[in-house]
Structures are given as C-alpha cells and as structure tokens.
C-alpha cells in the first residue's frame, strides 16, 4: 500500500519580557525567537513535530531568510514513502550537504514521531529513562546592573543551583564586578560559570582567565575564537579553570580535535548545532569514551525544542544540562513545560508529551509528497 505524507512548516515569533531578553557577545540583543515547526503526518498514522530556531545566524552562519528554503530543499530530497527509520537514516546522510538547522528540523520531527508511534518518551526511544523533571542551570544575560541583581535574586529564590553569566559584552572590569556581586549573593555552594562566546584572543584569554580564578567558577565557556584550536589550547594550558567548547564544535573534525584534547576540556552539545538528536547521541558516546565532560544544552528556543533537549539529557545523563531556553516566554505556541525548584518539569506521554497549537502560528508551506 502506498503511503502519502503531508508536510507543514509553521512559524511563530516568541517573545521574552525585556528583563529576560537574550544578549550575548556573539548575538547582540535578540528581541524575539523566530521559531519554525515542521509537522509530518503520514497516511499510515505516523505523526511527529519538531521545532528549530531560524534567527541563529551567529551560530549557524545561515541567514534567517535562508532557513525555510533549506528545510524545504531537504524535504524534497527524501523518499517519504519509506519507513520513518529509513527516512531518518537518509536525513543523516545529507548532514554534510545541507545546513544543520534544516536536518535538525526534519530529524527532530522524525524522532518525536518515532517515539510517539512506539508509545514511549523520546528519552526512552534514545535508550534512556523518562523523568518528570531535570535539573538545569539558569542564565544571566548582559543587562543593566539593577536588572542583573534583580534576576540573580529571583533565580536563587527559585532554587536554581547553577548560574551562568554572559560576559565579554562590556568591559572586563564590569564583568568582574558582576561576578563579585553574584558570588556575594549566592554564597559558596552555588555553581557559577561564565560564557565569553568566543570574544577573546589567546593573549586576552590567558590574562582574563587568571583574573577569573578567584571566583571558583565551574567552567568558562568558549573563551577563544571558535575554530582557533591553537588559541584554545594556549588558554587551556594557562589556567586551572575548566574550559568548555561550544561554538567551536561545528563539525565532526572539531569533535575529533576535542576528543584528542581529552578530559582537561568540556564539550557543549546542541541539537541544532550538530544536526539532530542522533548526532548528539553519537557525539556524547565519543566524548564519554575520550573522558570529555559534556553539557547538553540548546539555543534559547521554544518549549517544544526545549523539551526535546531535556529528553536528550534524560537519556544521556551529561555532567551539565542547560535547559532554560523557554523560561519566561510570553507567547509560546507549545504548552506543557514549566520550571520549579531549579528544574525543568515535563509532561508525561509518548513522544515529547507537549501540546502544540498550530492555529497560533503562520503557515509557511503545506505539501503532500510521495517520494523524491
């Protein structure tokens, strides 16, 4: 019996209140998240939905306006009359030919649908166990001092035990003052980390890491320019602080390089950066074998993408989990995800268990397909 597939791509702009807007050294201020939702519905009953964020040019190097055509191009390359597992495998074979944000959109929807079809959570589909809640860090983006302090007090009051501070936006002296105030508010028991988003040269990193050592940081994320492994190694050899690679993990060659560096470094894995959940699982296995500690995290994204990342964290049990992406969003089109006691709380149910309201989105395209 032939199978027909309906593919629908939706868009929604998700907004934070002003105090929670994204502002990093790499991104600048982001007023809203430009979300995309791919919905796959087959005549055999298979159904899955996946979310990615389009306005991440500073990470993906793909203009926002090119994301929709990239997703459509990949969809038209695939044989949709094949079994979903075969489509997922074919999608992975295209990862070197199309932008990872496009493969992530398709793979996220397929993985969610496969878990739903099998009557299990995504965490179980990926080989782990589902949990109702997962501990997460929280993030203090660049903001005026009064906002920084107000949010620090709020996050600590909400029992977040891990706080990450975005630095390298203003002067380093301001960064030091903010960290001193946060440590004063948090005390010695709270984990504090910083993220420079690749803003420093090797020499600047060496000097500034030395100045940061007094704050007893859990790690410093992406201190040097992504892709400059010579600079990263110089920084790594200059400090006792753990250093984490994020933007610098752009492809398989970067994974190889960090595996060779080994346990003295940390890795930050993101679905949209690597191309989909299977790539995250594969990279996690490689880093575990190499002794590299891992954080599984995300871009700031809506609740559907955040829930998927959280289920990956459930399955893979990384050292750190960064799952604050949908915290505080005012108009998310996906419901079911909440935060309590420093944890992200997820609904039960097959797949992701969340509820997606396509009626609140803009329709980008809607196609019935057979095969390429």
Which positions does each model-derived feature cover?
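Metal-dependent enolase-superfamily TIM-barrel catalytic cores that perform enediolate-based chemistry
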Residues: 124-239
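Metal- or metallocofactor-binding catalytic centers and their adjacent structured scaffolds
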Residues: 3-11, 41-117
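Short, Gly/Pro- and small/polar-rich lid/capping loops
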Residues: 1-36
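N-terminal amphipathic alpha-helix/helix-capping segment at the start of soluble metabolic enzymes
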Residues: 2-10, 116, 120-132, 344
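Shared catalytic-loop signature of beta/alpha-barrel
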Residues: 216, 227-242, 249-350
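A cross-domain feature marking catalytic cores of carbohydrate-active enzymes
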Residues: 52, 138-140, 165-167, 194-198, ...
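Short beta-strand elements
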Residues: 36-42, 335-337
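Conserved, mostly hydrophobic/aromatic
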Residues: 38, 45, 106, 119, ...
């Amino acid at each position: 019996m032939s199978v027909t597939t309906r593919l629908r791509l939706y868009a929604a702009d998700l907004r934070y209140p002003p105090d929670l807007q994204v502002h990093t050294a790499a991104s600048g201020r982001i007023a809203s998240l430009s979300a995309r939702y791919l919905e796959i519905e087959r005549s055999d009953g298979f159904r899955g939905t996946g979310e990615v964020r389009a306005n991440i040019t500073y990470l993906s190097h793909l203009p926002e306006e090119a994301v929709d055509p990239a997703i459509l191009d990949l969809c038209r390359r695939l044989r949709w009359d094949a079994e979903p597992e075969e489509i997922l495998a074919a999608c992975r074979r295209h990862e070197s030919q199309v932008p990872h944000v496009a493969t992530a959109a398709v793979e996220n929807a397929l993985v969610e649908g496969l878990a739903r079809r099998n009557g299990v959570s995504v965490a179980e589909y990926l080989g782990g166990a589902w949990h109702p809640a997962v501990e997460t860090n929280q993030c203090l983006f660049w903001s005026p001092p009064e906002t920084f302090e107000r949010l620090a007090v709020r996050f600590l009051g909400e029992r977040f035990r891990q706080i990450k501070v975005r630095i390298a936006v203003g002067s380093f002296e301001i960064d030091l003052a903010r960290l001193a105030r946060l440590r004063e508010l948090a005390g010695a028991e709270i984990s504090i980390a910083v993220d420079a988003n690749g803003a420093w040269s090797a020499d600047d990193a060496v000097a500034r890491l030395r100045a940061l050592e007094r704050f007893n940081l859990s790690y410093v994320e992406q201190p040097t320019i992504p892709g400059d492994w010579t600079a990263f190694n110089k920084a790594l050899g200059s400090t006792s602080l753990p250093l984490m690679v994020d933007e610098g993990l752009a492809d398989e060659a970067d994974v190889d390089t960090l595996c060779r560096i080994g346990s003295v470094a940390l890795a930050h894995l993101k679905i949209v950066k690597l191309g989909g959940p299977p790539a995250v699982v594969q990279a996690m296995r490689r880093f575990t074998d190499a002794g590299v500690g891992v954080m599984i995290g995300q871009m700031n994204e809506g609740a559907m993408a955040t829930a998927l990342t959280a289920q990956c964290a459930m399955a893979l049990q990384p050292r750190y989990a960064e799952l604050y992406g949908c915290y505080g969003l005012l108009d998310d089109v996906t419901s079911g995800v909440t935060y309590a006691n420093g944890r992200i709380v997820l609904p039960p149910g097959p797949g992701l268990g969340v509820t997606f309201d396509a009626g609140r989105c803009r329709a980008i395209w809607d196609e019935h397909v057979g095969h390429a």
